[in-house]
């Protein structure tokens, strides 16, 4: 998911700030 444009994935998953 990280760095890959995916509508199903939220950026907060990569940053750890959800």
Swiss-Prot record:
<protein>
    <recommendedName>
        <fullName>Alpha-conotoxin PeIVA</fullName>
    </recommendedName>
</protein>
<keyword id="KW-0872">Ion channel impairing toxin</keyword>
<dbReference type="GO" id="GO:0035792">
    <property type="term" value="C:host cell postsynaptic membrane"/>
</dbReference>
<dbReference type="GO" id="GO:0099106">
    <property type="term" value="F:ion channel regulator activity"/>
</dbReference>
<dbReference type="GO" id="GO:0030550">
    <property type="term" value="F:acetylcholine receptor inhibitor activity"/>
</dbReference>
<feature type="modified residue" description="4-hydroxyproline">
    <location>
        <position position="5"/>
    </location>
</feature>
<keyword id="KW-0964">Secreted</keyword>
<feature type="modified residue" description="4-hydroxyproline">
    <location>
        <position position="11"/>
    </location>
</feature>
<dbReference type="GO" id="GO:0090729">
    <property type="term" value="F:toxin activity"/>
</dbReference>
<comment type="function">
    <text>Alpha-conotoxins act on postsynaptic membranes, they bind to the nicotinic acetylcholine receptors (nAChR) and thus inhibit them. This toxin has higher affinity for the fetal (alpha-1/beta-1/gamma/delta subunits) subtype (IC(50)=&lt;5 nM) of the receptor than for the adult (alpha-1/beta-1/epsilon/delta) subtype (IC(50)=4000 nM). It blocks the elicited currents completely and dissociates very slowly from the fetal muscle receptor.</text>
</comment>
<keyword id="KW-0629">Postsynaptic neurotoxin</keyword>
<keyword id="KW-0800">Toxin</keyword>
<keyword id="KW-1015">Disulfide bond</keyword>
<keyword id="KW-0008">Acetylcholine receptor inhibiting toxin</keyword>
<dbReference type="GO" id="GO:0005576">
    <property type="term" value="C:extracellular region"/>
</dbReference>
<comment type="similarity">
    <text>Belongs to the conotoxin A superfamily.</text>
</comment>
<keyword id="KW-0379">Hydroxylation</keyword>
<keyword id="KW-0528">Neurotoxin</keyword>
